[in-house]
């Protein structure tokens, strides 16, 4: 019997945890191993099912991967691919590179924050300027849905995803139908505020 293991190369000395708490050590090692084997040539939470990077996975996983490895190359490539999707829609795609042109409004709004993450680790002002141009175009897309008070309503620029099972939504009962229901959807507005602040 043979098995082949592969993963993104990581220097274990790039990020260490000093604690006497054995449970915390175990959690840290589990997280490190998860990033090592779960991050391959892209940020995929299920490489056997997903054939492109989802920007939501990128936003979460890159945070841990960059701190654990000190390596920003994969993050930069993912942002480049994400920005390239603006050639198809200024609202950005949720999956890239991919022929599957899915738009998830919430995920698109993560781009400015992820771009700032790259800058925080690289200090690359030229790349930050490029991402600022894309972020400006992205925010213009969403400003079209702004009410008088600045909150967004009836955002139809892609799917409004609340990635929680219905039984775990803590009675959040906003109609997440396609197209989105009437009213002010808190989740998309939280992402929008985060994008504007970034």
Predicted segments, located by residue:
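Aromatic/His-enriched, Gly/Pro-containing loop or helix-boundary segments
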Residues: 94-103
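Active-site acid/base region of carbohydrate-active enzymes
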Residues: 5-30, 36, 43-92, 121-187
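Generic alpha-helical secondary structure signal
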Residues: 26, 30, 77, 106, ...
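Short glycine/serine- and small hydrophobic-enriched flexible loop segments
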Residues: 63-67, 113-120, 194-198
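Hydrophobic alpha-helical segments with strong N-terminal bias
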Residues: 44-47, 97, 108
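Short helix-capping and inter-helix turn/linker motifs at the boundaries of alpha-helical repeat units
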Residues: 52, 105-106
């Amino acid at each position: 019997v043979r098995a082949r293991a592969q993963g993104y190369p990581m220097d274990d000395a790039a990020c260490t945890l000093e604690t006497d708490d054995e449970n915390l050590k175990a959690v840290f090692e589990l997280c490190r191993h998860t990033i090592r084997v779960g991050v391959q040539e892209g940020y995929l939470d299920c490489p056997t099912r997903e054939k492109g990077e989802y920007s939501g996975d990128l936003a979460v996983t890159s945070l841990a991967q960059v701190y654990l490895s000190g390596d920003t190359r994969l993050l930069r490539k993912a942002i480049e691919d994400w920005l390239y999707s603006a050639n198809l829609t200024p609202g950005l795609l949720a999956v890239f590179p991919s022929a599957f042109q899915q738009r998830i409004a919430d995920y698109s709004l993560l781009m400015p924050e992820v771009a700032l993450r790259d800058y925080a680790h690289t200090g690359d002002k030229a790349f930050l300027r490029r991402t600022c141009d894309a972020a400006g175009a992205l925010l213009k897309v969403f400003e079209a849905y702004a009410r008088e008070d600045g909150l967004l309503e009836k955002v139809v620029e892609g799917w409004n995803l609340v990635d929680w099972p219905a039984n775990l939504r803590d009675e959040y009962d906003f109609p997440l139908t396609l197209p989105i229901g009437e009213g002010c959807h808190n989740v998309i507005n939280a992402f929008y505020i985060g994008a504007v602040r970034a």
